[in-house]
């Protein structure tokens, strides 16, 4: 049975980090769903793209194997300020379930109180980095620490997605080839 992944969307989410991620995870054989934190069936991102979600956050996430927090502003801030979201983050962490956060969204992990002593990354810049003074902050594209996967931003969405697929027992190698990732990575663009 395919592993279930919930991508949490708040108003102002980063579209690339959410929708391209959703597409890639589904291509990789995961049962990925968009979950609204707004109570609405349609959620608008930070660049005006509106997406229809699969379910609401008020529904239980207990049957999911992973939750993912996309960045974008004010999306990541809205996720951070939603006590239901930080509650689910703490619950998944305590149950050793997978948690992913990209771009500005690691701020949600910090607010939930799960970053102390952890190795992670986020969108570059002092504004974000100073949130993680009690963490082992890295400049790597993707960082995996136990059941926590973090990444830098929109351009790192594919490596983030591939790391998630592999972490949940899939094999991203054929997907990388089929999506021309290795070719693009080798190019001098």
Q: Residue spans of the language-model regions?
A:
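Extended, subdomain-level signal for the structured scaffold at the beginning of enzyme domains
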Residues: 1-95, 108-117, 127-139, 147-189
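Cytochrome P450 catalytic-domain "roof"
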Residues: 144
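Short, thiol/selenol-centered motifs that function as redox-active sites or metal-ligating centers
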Residues: 102-103
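Anionic-ligand binding patches
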Residues: 120
């Amino acid at each position: 049975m395919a592993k279930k992944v919930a991508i949490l969307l708040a108003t102002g989410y980063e579209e690339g980090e959410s929708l391209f991620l959703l597409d890639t995870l589904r291509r990789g054989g995961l049962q990925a769903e968009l979950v609204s934190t707004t109570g609405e069936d349609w959620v608008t991102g930070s660049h005006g793209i509106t997406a229809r979600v699969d379910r609401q956050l008020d529904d239980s996430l207990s049957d999911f194997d992973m939750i993912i927090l996309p960045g974008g502003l004010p999306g990541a801030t809205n996720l951070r300020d939603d006590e239901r979201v930080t509650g689910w983050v703490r619950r998944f962490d305590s149950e050793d379930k997978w948690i992913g956060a990209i771009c500005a969204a690691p701020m949600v992990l910090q607010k939930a109180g799960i970053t102390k002593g952890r190795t992670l990354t986020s969108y570059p810049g002092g504004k974000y980095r100073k949130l993680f003074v009690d963490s082992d902050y890295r400049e790597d594209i993707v960082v995996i620490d136990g059941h926590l996967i973090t990444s830098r931003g929109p351009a790192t969405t594919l490596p983030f997605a591939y790391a998630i697929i592999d972490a949940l027992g899939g094999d991203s190698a054929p997907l990388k080839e089929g999506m021309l990732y290795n070719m693009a990575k080798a190019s001098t663009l």
